[in-house]
Amino acid sequence: MKFVHSATRTRDLDAAIRFYKMLGMRLDHKSELTKNKATLAFMVPPEENFAIELVYNWGKDSPYEGGERFGHFAWLVDDLDVTYRRLVEGGAQEVGRTPAPLQGEGQRIAFVADPDGNWIELIEHRD
């Protein structure tokens, strides 16, 4: 068995694609589901072993159901400060904590939010 993707809903597909590109991902492909009135965009990292499926439902005005149950995505980064600054300057929302050590774990973490408010954890391991 292999874990292949996680799906998150978006209200602005283009903004979501731009955000995940800032994290080094690329758009693998899009699928138009006309019967469901939805567009799916699959964003993959360079290793291509996992995807984030961005789900855009056309014409939906009310909040998506189930959104409050999601925790966060996590990325391992080489330089936390550089990545955090690039994302914030690119429009990511600062949430949770700014770059700081995680007590007793030998790593530093920070959180930002994507255009739809999903939290993204950035992790830098320290030797």
List PLM regions with ranges:
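Short, charged/polar surface micro-motifs in flexible loops or helix N-caps
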Residues: 47-50, 60-61, 80-81
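Short, solvent-exposed aromatic-acidic interface loops
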Residues: 58-60, 127
